A protein has these predicted regions:
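A short aromatic-anchored loop/beta-hairpin motif
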Residues: 1-60, 65, 76
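Flexible, glycine/proline-enriched loop segments at strand-loop-helix junctions
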Residues: 24-25, 78-88, 126, 158-159
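Polyanion-binding loop/helix "lid" in catalytic or ligand-binding cores
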Residues: 32-33, 145-190
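Glycine-rich phosphate- or other oxyanion-binding loops that anchor nucleotides, phosphorylated ligands
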Residues: 59-103
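Active-site beta-strand/loop microenvironment that shapes enzyme catalytic pockets
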Residues: 87-135
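Gly/Ser/Thr-rich active-site loops/lids in small-molecule metabolic enzymes
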Residues: 127-150
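Membrane-interface soluble catalytic domains
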Residues: 191-206
Length: 206
């Protein structure tokens, strides 16, 4: 059964061996949110992890550093490509059925790795675009409301947002939707001081 699910940013700057002390202080809320998730992960003791990411290296490594650094169980990685959000939502549904997650006797953790808009500030990696902050705000509101229908449309509504997490999040949401587990989205932190939106969210499962 699924007993843990979350959204995690994956910026290497969050890591103590990469980010400077000053940079990490600037994203203190994000780091605190990730450590909170790490404590939750330890408390719930999942036996295996399913983690999705648009990047094959830091996309997996950064969330796992904070959440499951000493984890010894099985880790299944799912690499996200450029297909539509709806495609990955359906992939999540198929993944749930293919691996018979419903009937497993083990506890499973879901981690959706991804960053929000990279266009929040002129000095950010892709400059500023008004789609950026609008996308981030609406995505967070939709997650709170469990409004999957509109989440799947955000890519078309804000095509210049420059995000890299939406499809990863949709994969996780597809799994949750198929599981029929009731959940509430708890936003632990959101900030974008470097022009990239970092969201940390916990799905409270019941």
């Amino acid at each position: 059964m699924i007993n843990f699910a979350c959204i995690s940013p994956h910026a290497p700057i969050l890591l103590p061996d990469v980010g400077s002390k000053e940079d990490r202080e600037t994203v203190k809320k994000t780091i605190e949110g990730l450590y909170f998730l790490g404590e939750k992960f330890k408390e719930l003791k999942p036996d295996s992890i399913i983690i999705s990411s648009p990047h094959p290296d830091w996309g997996f490594n950064v969330p796992l550093y904070f959440l499951a650094r000493d984890f010894k169980g099985e880790i299944k990685t799912f690499l996200i490509g450029n297909e539509t959000p709806e495609f990955y939502f359906n992939q999540g549904k198929e993944f749930y059925t293919k691996y018979d997650i419903q009937n497993t006797k083990y506890n499973v953790a879901l981690i959706a790795s991804g960053d929000l808009s990279h266009c929040l500030k002129e000095e950010g990696p892709y400059g500023f675009h008004p789609d950026g902050p609008k996308f981030d705000k609406e995505l967070i509101e939709c997650l709170k409301k469990k409004d999957i229908e509109n989440i799947l449309k955000l890519d078309n509504i804000y095509p210049e947002a420059g995000e890299c997490g939406l499809r990863s999040f949709c994969f996780l949401l597809g799994i949750l939707e198929t599981s029929k587990i009731n959940y509430q989205t708890e936003i632990l932190s959101y900030e974008g001081p470097f022009g990239v939106g970092y969201l940390v969210a916990n799905f409270k499962l019941s």
